[in-house]
């Protein structure tokens, strides 16, 4: 089978696993009486990302071939996610938060590092095969978005967003991906057997990137954009779902199929990914990130203004700009980091980026978003418009600060 096709299948499966529950699990938690804990479930993704991606990246760089470690992560993530589904099935609406949370946390502790490993495995295989990363990686990665959309739609059509079956589907797909990973080309560790310093021994060389001013600023703003990402992951579908309580929107398509409406965000991703090579080569990482930040401002603003009735076009616009907001940082940023480091640090540097976005960014974003939502909730009713305006103002401040502070030389950031 063609190598690019094999990597595209891996990308499809990687994000199909996540798409099965990421955008709709808030609906399930609300149904079982855990609505006030939604932020905690998203925050734990950030907490485990504070150390697991970097740790697994170090292991992949030094001791265990990345593709084998990648498969192991999915074996463990899938097993624990199936336990989440089993527990939900067994106890229904009587689930205990601490037990459900613990099982979920164990699963994402292994899934989150698989995200960074999927990139490093792909980059390693492409490099060894002489494939142009800037030209061909976006075409491979787009299948990840397609996989995410596919399981989102499947979950919505089967009404799994209301129950624990979304986790069962995710767990099953993880186990399939574990088996598939066993067939991937080898990604040999890059480390020599020579004597190393203590920093070398613990694989902390990736943190030396902070010695470069432009990389330090880049990683700090990666945290700020990670906050934006997990605000929308945690509450966008819950926001759309709340219109079910309003009679005037009862028959609206977005109310009947909130996950399908939300999946327009991922459809936008599939197109925007293909724009990355052009924008990165022509405009560089700073301008691409500024475009992403402006898109986050518009994303939150349109959500605050829209509704499933005569304002549905604003909701659709918010889904469209999400593709720009996500891809123009997450994908471009990953490629930028890969080009900025030594091949020996490929996995650990991707883990470091994951630490910033899905570690600190996710933890801070989830907790802040939950606090804002709770502060604007009265008698069980959330003042969503105010919440989205607050989030839009935050994204605007981040954008302005980045424009002023991040000043790399043009030749350093054109890939």
Over which residues does each language-model region extend?
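Juxtamembrane intracellular "pre-TM" segments in multi-pass secondary transporters
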Residues: 1, 185-220, 245-250
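Helix-loop boundary and gating motifs at the non-cytosolic
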Residues: 1-50, 214-250, 257, 261, ...
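Central cavity-lining transmembrane alpha-helices of secondary-active solute carriers
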Residues: 40-61, 260-275
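Multi-pass alpha-helical transporter architecture, strongest
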Residues: 55, 83-89, 174-188, 359, ...
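A membrane-interface helix-boundary motif in multi-pass transporters
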Residues: 96, 157-174, 371-395
């Amino acid at each position: 089978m063609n190598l690019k096709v094999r990597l595209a299948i891996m990308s499809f499966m990687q994000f199909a696993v996540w798409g099965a529950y990421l955008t709709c699990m808030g609906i399930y938690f609300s149904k079982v009486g855990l609505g006030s804990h939604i932020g905690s479930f998203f925050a734990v993704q950030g907490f485990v990302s504070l150390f697991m991606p970097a740790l697994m990246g170090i292991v992949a760089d030094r001791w265990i071939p990345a593709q084998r470690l990648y498969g192991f992560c999915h074996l463990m993530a899938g097993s624990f996610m199936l336990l989440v589904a089993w527990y939900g099935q067994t106890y229904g609406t009587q689930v205990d938060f601490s037990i459900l949370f613990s099982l979920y946390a164990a699963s994402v502790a292994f899934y989150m590092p698989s995200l960074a490993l999927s990139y490093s495995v792909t980059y390693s295989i492409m490099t060894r095969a002489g494939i142009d990363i800037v030209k061909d990686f976006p075409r491979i990665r787009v299948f990840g978005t397609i996989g995410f959309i596919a399981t989102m739609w499947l979950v919505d059509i089967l009404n799994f967003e209301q129950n624990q079956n979304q986790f069962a589907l995710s767990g099953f797909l993880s186990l399939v991906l574990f088996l598939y990973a066993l067939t991937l080309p080898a990604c040999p560790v890059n480390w020599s057997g020579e004597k190393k310093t203590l920093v070398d021994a613990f694989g902390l060389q990736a943190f030396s990137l902070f010695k470069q001013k432009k990389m330090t600023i880049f990683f700090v703003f990666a945290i700020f954009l990670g906050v934006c990402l997990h605000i929308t992951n945690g509450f966008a579908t819950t926001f759309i779902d709340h219109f079910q309580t309003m009679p005037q929107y009862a028959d609206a398509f977005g109310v009947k199929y909130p996950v399908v409406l939300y999946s327009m965000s991922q459809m936008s991703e599939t197109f925007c990914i293909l724009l990355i090579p052009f924008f990165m080569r022509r405009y560089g990482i700073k301008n691409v990130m500024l475009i992403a930040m402006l898109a986050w401002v518009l994303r939150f603003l349109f959500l605050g203004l829209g509704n499933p009735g005569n304002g549905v076009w604003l909701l659709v616009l918010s889904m469209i700009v999400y593709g720009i907001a996500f891809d123009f940082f997450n994908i471009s940023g990953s490629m930028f980091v890969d080009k900025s480091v030594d091949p020996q640090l490929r996995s650990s540097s991707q883990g470091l980026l994951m630490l910033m976005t899905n570690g600190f960014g996710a933890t801070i974003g989830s907790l802040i978003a939950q606090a804002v939502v709770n502060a604007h909730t009265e008698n069980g009713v959330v003042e969503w418009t105010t919440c989205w305006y607050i989030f839009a103002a935050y994204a605007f401040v981040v954008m302005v600060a980045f424009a002023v502070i991040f000043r790399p030389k043009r030749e350093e950031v054109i890939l």
